[in-house]
């Protein structure tokens, strides 16, 4: 169930912590291309970023491709993005080491 969420709902995609942000992502591996496909809300009302990568879900290749994609789109080093949960699932929680107050500006780069 895909939705174009208003800006005030985008904050539901991430949680701010003292020195990082936790971002909810739904990854489609073997998706033909590396891209951010917008924001999706599941049946439970939880929002997450939709991403696809061309890499296969074997040996962590799709996860590595996701980190490369997000780092490039956000303008952050790859080392600043790590997995908190979901390394073997489509739905993932990522830790992004960046100033939580600046994250909204960075996040808007993903849509561009």
UniProtKB/Swiss-Prot annotation:
This is UPF0235 protein Atu2660. GO terms for cellular component: cytoplasm. Belongs to the UPF0235 family. The lineage of its organism: Bacteria, Pseudomonadati, Pseudomonadota, Alphaproteobacteria, Hyphomicrobiales. InterPro entries: DUF167, YggU-like_sf. It comes from the Bacteria. It comes from Agrobacterium fabrum (strain C58 / ATCC 33970) (Agrobacterium tumefaciens (strain C58)).
């Amino acid at each position: 169930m895909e939705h174009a969420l208003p800006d005030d709902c985008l904050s539901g995609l991430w949680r701010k912590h003292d020195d990082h942000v936790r971002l909810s992502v739904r990854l489609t591996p073997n998706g033909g291309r590396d891209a951010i496909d917008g924001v999706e809300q599941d049946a439970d009302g939880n929002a997450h970023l939709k991403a696809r990568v061309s890499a296969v879900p074997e040996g962590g290749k799709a996860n590595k491709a996701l980190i490369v994609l997000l780092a490039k789109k956000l303008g952050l080093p790859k080392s600043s993005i790590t997995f908190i949960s979901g390394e073997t699932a489509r739905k993932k929680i990522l830790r992004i080491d960046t100033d939580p107050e600046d994250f909204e500006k960075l996040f808007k780069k993903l849509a561009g």
